[in-house]
């Protein structure tokens, strides 16, 4: 349990599912969405890891195409705004999942390597970080900082034991395009609604709660009464909290 492993199952399942825009069935439990978001410790079927510290959750690292480029390569007709939204969603899911998050430099400002998949032997103009992108992505970066800070402060997003994850986490698909991911422990509950489709969805929250995250807004603390209808735009997510 002291060693971590880059979770290719997380990487591939997230990217392929977001490209498809709908739920994808797999014969391998390690690729099940309920498992990849819960560090693959056996929420559904056999465990791939024994403890969450073993699961390095990522969608981008030094090899292969950047996430931003991946969506263009896989979906040539993709619009820029959709490409950005999918890239954000992939990155945010890394931070919402159990396990150890790994963020590659430049993901927060849609890093591109000119659609090249492997650039180890290519010049600096492809491998360098374009720092001018920072000024163009202030909203995305500010939101990401708040999400990272919230993850660090919220134990429910950082459960330490595999058994805790199996006991307290749950994921259900509401349709082929939407799922609800919950973590509930000691009268505290996080509900994360995710829309991977290209159409807006609505959801009725069954309990009184607080809306904390709804991109591009963070730390909202908006009271949501029981039964209120919530709208969730395409390729986005929201986080609700119940408890003290």
Task: Pin down the residues of each PLM region.
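Carbohydrate-interacting/catalytic domains
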Residues: 81-84, 95-103, 107-109, 113-244
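Conserved alpha/beta catalytic core and glycan-binding cleft of carbohydrate-active enzymes
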Residues: 1-110, 116, 120, 169, ...
